[in-house]
């Protein structure tokens, strides 16, 4: 995609006086950067003054030649809300349907969206859109119109070739309409073309991250936590040996007793020719300032009880030798987490070391498999049935990545049963991961059910193999992933889309949510598909270089292709110039397992 220049103008008396209170402007700039590649974004804050607003907009239109300007704030009913009035005087063409579309989609989220008066229109070669001032509303509005912006810019700029390209891509697609849940195919084209555009993987991920809300800002909580105690809280011995005064020199010393880990520090007098036998981690006596390790001593005498009474110190003691001072590892009021780490092992262990037992909130997840043909692995297989492997696979994947499945259920191909089950599940869970029922068959009811339940379907198809019908939908803070029913498709789309969303909701940093990626060399030629393909492969290490061997037949129904799969190789779509991925070529690969190297040569 070519570069689009954006401007984000925050219009608010409060933010103009206190810029740190502007949250909507930074959110918009972040969303633009995440959604559009090679994008230039400038921003500013102005007060709710009509003349000043117009002056800034004119400068951006004429001098900066921005293609899209998004204003945030000043669209309500308050006396100083004048953004639409300031904008209208600059517009050569108004775009009422675009404004209506934003309003209608926003009303699905809150009835108060009806109180926004934002305008959309064209001034010169610039598209101007008035968005509300709240952070939440800005995010929702941007998600509504982001996919339309490139085509709108092409139309305004009379970029004929790009306009024709977009028209060609959408030509023949059926218009999205309500589908009767009990309807079967009539044989007409409208039944056989998906109303959902096929979105690129990265665009789908951007939509997911911009939609899913974190259950808690774990990163913020952790980064602001200070240590309530010193670690160690006392001077601790680093080694097994003898605690003494460093001024006492080497030679024979009388052993006064033994101090073990867990004993209280003693404050008894200690002469220069005396010492205490001490264990690793034990507290030093108050008057001792060093430890001589047991290897640098020689036992001279035992008392009548078999306890050490005399020992020869073979080295000169030095102050601070083998002693951890108070607070050496962590001092009171130090930040506990100098950097973020998504690992619950790290987080819980470090918090436990300072006496803090943090209960990490995890998203509640349910697994649903649809299909009248499915039979539980515990039951006898009957004619026309197949065993349900998806429920087991998805449940185990959740556990493997540190999450729990609260509920599982298998549904027959019934609109009403599917609707009732989803309603019940969303009463108690945050995410439903469903396999099957999202394609174009006349028994695929899932998308119709979602529409009936007033979920917003953000994505109905992805430009990917396997997994094209992958669906993502939301309603407020409830999220639905519809994975294809073929086991391998469900496996791939879980890793690429559902897992990152659940991690993000759990408080992980966005950059840590997706699978780790490394580069691998192909061992053999592989025929490319018309869609970008994620191929299951095992990894072989040869002299420090990583090679990928494709795991046999990659058909989406063949679950055996995940056996021994270490990575998903990300292969590009086929072109006339490049029909093959050739042996020796390097491609990015998403890592599936912690132990991702199957063989060393």
From Swiss-Prot:
Lineage, opening ranks: Eukaryota, Metazoa, Ecdysozoa, Arthropoda, Hexapoda
Pathway participation: Cofactor biosynthesis; molybdopterin biosynthesis
Protein name: Molybdenum cofactor synthesis protein cinnamon
Family membership noted in the UniProt record: In the N-terminal section; belongs to the MoaB/Mog family. In the C-terminal section; belongs to the MoeA family.
EC numbers for this chain: 2.7.7.75, 2.10.1.1
Cofactor names: Mg(2+)
Enzyme class name: transferase
MPT adenylyltransferase as annotated region, ranges: 3-153
Reactions catalysed: molybdopterin + ATP + H(+) = adenylyl-molybdopterin + diphosphate; adenylyl-molybdopterin + molybdate = Mo-molybdopterin + AMP + H(+)
Annotated keywords: ATP-binding, Magnesium, Metal-binding, Molybdenum, Molybdenum cofactor biosynthesis, Multifunctional enzyme, Nucleotide-binding, Phosphoprotein, Transferase
Function in brief: Catalyzes two steps in the biosynthesis of the molybdenum cofactor. In the first step, molybdopterin is adenylated. Subsequently, molybdate is inserted into adenylated molybdopterin and AMP is released.
GO MF: ATP binding; metal ion binding; molybdopterin adenylyltransferase activity; molybdopterin molybdotransferase activity
